[in-house]
Amino acid sequence: VHAIEDLRADVPNVTSVSMVVSWFGDDLRCNECTLTPRVEHKDADGRPMPWLVSGQTRSTAQIVSYVEDRPVFGGTPADASILEAIAKLKDEGLDVVFYPFVLMDIQENNGLPDPYSDNDNQPVMPWRGRITLSKAAGQASSPDQTAAAGAEVAAFFGAAQVSDFAIVNGEVEYSGPNEWTYRRFILHYAHLCAIAGGVEAFNIGSELRGLTQIRDGLDSFPTVVALQQLARDVRAVLGPNTKLGYAADWSEYFGYHPQDGSGDVWFHLDPLWAQAEIDYIGLDNYMPLSD
């Protein structure tokens, strides 16, 4: 409530609010990466609103990493708190843009092979746009442009289906495969927004540059195909009144220019942005407000 009051005071003409909610990835190799909701601590739970996200309680959820006895991230908000926040924003006459966000909780000396080099450790807290194949395109033994690349992308997205989710007593329940994958992440929040009566807009993804540029053939981009299916599924959950889109990174939106000497340019996101379920072309760009 205080945050909304401060927003109204500082930006009186505001009409729309982005609601950013994070799950946490644990590996830059897409076939090894899991995405999970996490908490900052397990010392005490909220009353009368205990922490619950996608079937995880505070006692069963993972804890975000700590450095010098301090959490390096804020945790995932409880589902119930998100419903309250959406309701409050709507009461204030503000449009809600729901933004599921991937944070990479990878710390020093992680022992995870770096897909972009021969290093035995992946970088600390990397950008989600660096999630890629077991070996990135251009690296020796990369599966890019082979069927194996498609299989690795499929492992990241997972097999969760719309029918695996149910709304029971105002909560989202999941009964699908025992996996923590991208489809489970996005479809969970699509159903949560449905409980809230819908939102103005919903991002099905953002800044997944290292994934969207993966090829399982010369001109076939399996992540884009997976996002197209995800858009259809989210549309089935949220109906026709919620705008859907994908927010590309500023270095991703204009096409893929493989650094292989071919001179090729692939407008790989066009099939996604052109499909009927997508309402807007999103672009994450960080422009300075002043000199």
Residue ranges and their predicted role:
Residues 1-83, 88, 95, 99-181, ...:
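N-terminal substrate-binding region of glycoside hydrolase catalytic domains
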Residues 8, 83-90, 190-194, 235:
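A structural alpha-helix within SAM-dependent methyltransferase catalytic domains
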Residues 146-150, 154-291:
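Noncatalytic carbohydrate-binding groove/subsite architecture in carbohydrate-active enzymes
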